[in-house]
Amino acid sequence: MLFPISKQALSCPHFDSCAGCSHQLFVEPPIWREVIENFKETLNPILHQGTLTGWRCRAKLAVRGTKQNPIIGLFKKGSHEALNIPFCLVHHPRINQAVTMIQNWMERHQLNPYQEHSQAGDLRYLQFVVERASGKVQIVFVLNFKDFSSPESQIWRKLLLELAQETTNAFWHSIWVNFNPHATNTIFTDKWEKVWGEPYLWESFDGVKICFQPSNFAQANLDLFEKLLKKVKSWVREKAKVVEFFAGVGTIGLSVAAKCSWIKCEEINPHSKECFYYAKQQLSSEISQKIMFYTGSADENLNLLQGADTVIVDPPRKGLSRKFIEGLTQSSVDQLIYVSCGWDSFKKNKETLISQGWNLKKLEGYSLFPGSEHIELLTLFER
């Protein structure tokens, strides 16, 4: 159910020009109509919606403009011209506050925003992440340098350390740099450095503590995602033997581990392993000894399926490969919990799974990105 907020209160002042939202917040995601139509003969899909404003705890914003007038925001619709969005309704209030602080700080120190046409300038992007329990903000500066070896980059290092001291300890969680000197639209490279602050940002999901670094994937709408996690846990059978593919830092796997006989978590991003093990250490020895972590792609780790009866997947938008589905079907697994962030790929995967003997038993939608066409699907297949 939508929260009873007036349409006027949900009308974003940036909507007409900003590319961040495809429709106003008070409008149900149009793609949900297609989901309902697709399954109306077999299922009765439920759409879960949380709060519509202030939900985004994580934001990546472009930095453009000039020394005198830095712009921190998203690109205008149909262009690569950046737009300030100081009154963004979906941002956590701390993010909007942090953006204003950084703009003023850049003006004061006459710092150079990135210029796409010339590939000049220093600061390309910013990422802001709010730790829910403390309200502190982790900030990442994506700098147009290869490292901190040049005199210009050393000026930035000095200013970032000063920035940490300019505000109270209750505001910044940590200050990080990602070095990206390449002519690319890719925001982050693999080169990270913590300049100041705490090494890990911690979140608690139904009593299970999970930690993140800026290089790790995490959902932006954590409050609603926590409800999805609880439903996943309710679907996992007692004493299940589970393999989770595309596990990230283990948010799902660690959350359901208490119900399992054992759980193996697989993730391709090598940066996830460190956070996974730190979070694992927070669990009791009785639970932590059930949990194993493997690095590599899902297709390369199909041998993990041996002896399992349950698989949990949360793949990227391209979905599951045919090789993965074939390996899954040839295994002993009889329960598949599929978290999908790509409707088009899910439709194809669903048809392939059904053709190989799987039955779709349950489907729920989670509007993790109000204002967008994006719907997260939580589904249960059995055979």
Curated annotation (Swiss-Prot):
GO terms for molecular function: 4 iron, 4 sulfur cluster binding; metal ion binding; RNA methyltransferase activity. Gene3D superfamilies: 2.40.50.1070, Vaccinia Virus protein VP39 (3.40.50.150). S-adenosyl-L-methionine binds at Q219, F246, E267, D314. Keywords: 4Fe-4S, Iron, Iron-sulfur, Metal-binding, Methyltransferase, S-adenosyl-L-methionine, Transferase. The active site is at C341. Its EC number is 2.1.1.-. It is an enzyme of class 2 (transferase). It holds the Pfam family tRNA_U5-meth_tr. [4Fe-4S] cluster binds at C12, C18, C21, C88. InterPro entries: MeTrfase_TrmA_AS, RNA_M5U_MTase, SAM-dependent_MTases_sf, U5_MeTrfase_fam. GO terms for biological process: methylation; RNA processing. Belongs to the class I-like SAM-binding methyltransferase superfamily. RNA M5U methyltransferase family. This is Uncharacterized RNA methyltransferase pc1998. The lineage of its organism: Bacteria, Pseudomonadati, Chlamydiota, Chlamydiia, Parachlamydiales.
